[in-house]
A protein has these predicted regions:
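Conserved glycine-rich cofactor-binding loop
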Residues: 15
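Conserved S-adenosyl-L-methionine
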Residues: 28-34, 139-142
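C-terminal substrate-binding/catalytic lobe of Rossmann-fold NAD(P)-dependent dehydrogenases
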Residues: 138-144, 153-330
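Rossmann-like NAD(P)-binding element
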Residues: 55-119
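Rossmann-like NAD(P)(H) cofactor-binding subdomain of soluble oxidoreductases
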Residues: 91-159
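Generic hydrophobic/aromatic pocket-lining and core-packing "Φ" positions
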Residues: 23-24, 107
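Conserved N-terminal Rossmann-fold NAD(P) cofactor-binding segment
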Residues: 6, 31-75, 90, 309-312, ...
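N-terminal Rossmann-fold NAD(P) dinucleotide-binding loop
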Residues: 19-20
Length: 330
């Protein structure tokens, strides 16, 4: 079996549903034979490793560990789904604080054990701020760390396809930018359906409102239908992001990236932008949209700034002016 690279891929949180799906997807796509599965829960990660062995992927060299030093040392590519899910009785602040503390430790492990890592993808929520926290603590350059944001755009693509009665792949140029959550900005003014402008389909204001709602609530709908949060789609898209970073097919769905751009008017946040991930890292361009779309993006950015200030107030990351003390690349 041919592989894209032989470099070590570390999957953090590998004992969970997302992590185990990432391991299998990476092997099925032939990204690398050398995959390390890491989790703090020994039986779960051990079980995932056994499943991968039973798949009998030719040439695969799958290892597992609960020791962070063993896991992170030598890793060149990392995907982390290692956050904690929201549980009954937890407030939003509980989730924010808990997962950002996990993200801070994750970043510290990178700085200590694998500072030469090529690319890192963070996918545990709230992804915009967990990724920002990890970046600050890791010491990495901004183009080396991204967060998962593509699902919002693929959900928009699905909703538009259903509304227009076409296969999903025939809907193009529809994206969501800004935050990963209810404050996301939906950009569809340049969308095309089977090569035709979306405007030719005369979607009513009421139907458009439904499309936006169903896009934003796409993750919640999965929970209602399946009784648990998404795991197959985030696993697949995260692995495709790493594939781009490994030098495979560039990843062109929006990704969360560090933005400090005077021209855009967005400063010191992680947010979804028009991006490409390739072997040189992640690169973003300025979003282009209608006045209303850009206004929604500004609102989303302002919400991200508030979340950033929350983790600063919690002491998880320092004030913006002190970030260079932890990461000279910011």
């Amino acid at each position: 079996m041919g592989f894209l690279t032989n470099e070590k891929l570390l999957i953090v949180g590998a004992g969970g549903a997302i992590g185990s799906n990432m391991a299998q997807t990476a092997l099925m796509l032939g990204l690398t034979p050398n995959i390390c599965l890491y989790d703090i829960i020994e039986p779960a990660v051990h079980g995932v490793a056994e499943e991968m062995y039973h798949c009998a992927f030719p040439g695969a060299n799958v290892t597992w560990t609960t020791d962070p030093k063993e896991a992170f040392t030598g890793a060149k590519f990392i995907i982390s789904s290692g956050g904690a899910p929201r549980k009954d009785g937890m407030t939003r602040e509980d989730l924010l604080k808990g997962n950002c503390q996990i993200a801070a430790q994750f970043g510290d492990y990178i700085k200590e054990y694998c500072p030469d890592v090529n690319h890192v993808v963070v996918i545990f929520n709230p992804a915009d701020v967990t990724a920002l926290t990890a970046l600050i603590h890791s010491g990495l350059k901004p183009n080396q760390l991204t967060s998962l944001a593509a699902l919002d755009s693929t959900r928009l693509q699905e909703q538009l396809a259903k509304a227009c009665g076409v296969p999903q792949y025939k809907v193009t140029d529809c994206y969501t930018y800004g935050g990963h959550g209810e404050q996301m900005a939906v950009f569809a003014s340049k969308a095309k359906v089977d090569g035709k402008p979306l405007s030719e389909y005369n979607i009513s204001e009421e139907r458009w409102a439904e499309i936006k709602h169903d896009t934003i609530q796409g993750g919640s709908n999965i929970i209602k239908l399946r009784g648990r949060s998404s795991f197959q789609s985030p696993a697949y898209q995260a692995v495709k992001m790493i594939e781009g970073a490994m030098g495979g097919t560039p990843f062109t769905w929006p990704a969360g990236c560090y933005v400090d751009c005077d021209k855009c008017g967005f400063k010191n946040v992680m947010m979804a932008m028009p991006t490409t991930i390739d072997a040189t890292g992640v690169h973003f361009t300025e979003p282009q949209g209608t006045e209303a779309e850009m206004a929604d993006l500004r609102k989303s950015y302002e919400h991200l700034c508030k979340m950033r200030e929350e983790i600063i107030a919690l002491g998880i990351v320092p004030p913006v002016e002190d970030w260079k003390k932890d990461n000279v690349n910011l």
